[in-house]
């Protein structure tokens, strides 16, 4: 019982084959530079990496090559593609159209295309992957799993923006939220670690990577999240500004004669901790510079830590407390100092970390708070691919029962 998980980028294709009985990854890889003169596939199976150079003009050629490798005598994990019970596609934006994973049909693809305005950089790539698979393996069921779907349970008073209501009605301008697959995985996983039902918990999950978002989860459902209409909103990130006074945009656009696209580039690619520090998009580099006395690097980290702690505090108010706080993704899993600094800012609430144990946890799964912390704090490495595989399996099985 195997599922292929696909994440199609504009010029890349990431994949995993997961055995659903053991939930182990049998093979995974990354196809890069699709559509360019030289394309490369890194394929990992049985702990060994294999690299291939092949010219893939488009996603269909890349997927055909990957599927051949998966049933290859030397590099494969299946005798035939018939062993696949389904293919799960990661889709960034489902708008208000999709509140849960769906079996992919021509009608579903058309509806996803309607959401492209909300995710012009991501949805078209996912569609390419779906359409290619429909041509190559038309008999294998496919499921679309949306990053935004988990947040469709956020109440209206929290997802509406305080601008004229007609903009929501005409253009769908509202908070959608992202990283939903990660937030859902971590919520269910930490409930397992605590030996409790996720429906009995109030969880605040901090997904901190190059991009980052905080999510308030109550009764297993998202009730608020920091990202908004796009992944630009919310906490300060590596190169993204996060929340700021909207007048900053109009001031800079007038002062520097910037158009909307140029302003968007500044906010998405030149801001965040990189913009403040002027050092790097990598938090580790900024930490090194801060430790050596660079004031702007230290300020960048302080702004980031304040930003995350502020959202955690906000969501404790929104839910009337929290039963657990979790850290996940690159910085959340491996940034021991950032975890400590964020929790130090929350000590008013009685939140503490075991400083020694926290420093020992780098990418591992464990509780990092002492027993006298008012709220337990966990590090839970995310696994979006496994969550997509689970959702794909569940969606297919439910469809078969109907």
Tell where the protein language model's regions lie, with residue ranges.
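Phosphate/pyrophosphate-binding loops at sites that engage ATP/ADP/AMP, CoA/4′-phosphopantetheine
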Residues: 69-84, 190-197, 312-323
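Adenine-nucleotide phosphate-binding core of ATP-dependent small-molecule kinases
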Residues: 265, 272-276, 283-318
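Glycine-rich phosphate-binding loop of actin/hexokinase-like ATP-binding domains
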Residues: 150-253
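Extreme N-terminal starter segment of soluble prokaryotic enzymes
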Residues: 1-4
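Short glycine-rich, Thr/Ser-proximal phosphate-binding strand/loop in the N-terminal lobe
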Residues: 12-56, 228
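Internal helix-turn-beta structural module
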Residues: 298, 302-318, 323, 332-402
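Catalytic phosphate/nucleotide-handling subdomain of diverse soluble enzymes
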Residues: 218, 223-256, 265, 329-360, ...
């Amino acid at each position: 019982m195997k599922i292929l998980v696909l994440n199609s980028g504009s010029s890349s294709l990431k994949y995993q084959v997961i055995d659903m009985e053991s939930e182990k990854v049998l093979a995974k890889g990354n196809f890069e530079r699709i559509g360019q003169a030289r394309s490369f596939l890194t394929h990992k199976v049985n702990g060994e990496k294999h690299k291939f150079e092949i010219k893939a003009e488009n996603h269909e050629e890349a997927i055909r090559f990957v599927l051949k490798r998966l049933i290859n005598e030397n590099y494969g994990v299946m005798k035939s593609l018939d062993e696949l019970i389904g293919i799960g596609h990661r889709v960034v934006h489902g708008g208000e159209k999709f509140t849960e994973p769906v079996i992919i049909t021509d009608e579903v693809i058309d509806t996803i295309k309607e959401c492209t305005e909300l995710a012009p950089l991501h949805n078209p790539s996912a569609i390419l992957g779906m359409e290619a698979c429909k041509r190559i393996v038309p008999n294998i069921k496919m499921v679309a799993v949306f990053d935004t779907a988990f947040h469709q349970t956020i109440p209206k008073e929290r997802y509406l923006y305080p601008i004229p209501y007609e903009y929501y009605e005409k253009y769908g301008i509202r908070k959608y939220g992202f990283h939903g697959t990660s937030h859902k995985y971590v919520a269910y996983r930490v409930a397992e670690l605590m030996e409790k039902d996720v429906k009995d918990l109030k969880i605040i999950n901090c997904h901190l990577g190059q991009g980052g978002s905080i999510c308030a989860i109550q009764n297993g459902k998202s009730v608020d999240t920091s990202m908004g209409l796009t992944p630009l909103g919310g906490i300060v990130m590596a190169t993204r500004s996060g929340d700021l006074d909207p007048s900053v945009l109009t001031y800079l656009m007038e002062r520097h004669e910037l158009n909307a696209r140029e302003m968007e580039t500044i906010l998405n690619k030149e801001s965040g901790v990189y913009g403040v520090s002027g050092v790097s998009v990598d938090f580790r580099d900024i930490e090194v510079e801060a430790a050596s006395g660079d004031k702007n690097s230290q300020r960048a980290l302080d702004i980031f830590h304040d930003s995350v702690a502020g959202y955690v505090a906000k969501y404790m108010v929104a839910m009337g407390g929290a039963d657990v706080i979790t850290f996940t993704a690159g910085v959340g899993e491996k940034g021991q100092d950032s975890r400590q600094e964020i929790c130090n800012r929350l000590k008013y609430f009685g939140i503490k970390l075991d400083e020694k144990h926290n420093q020992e946890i780098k990418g591992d799964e464990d509780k990092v708070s002492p027993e006298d912390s008012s709220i337990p704090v966990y590090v839970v490495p995310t696994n979006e691919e496994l969550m997509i595989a689970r959702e794909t399996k569940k969606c297919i099985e439910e469809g078969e029962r109907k």
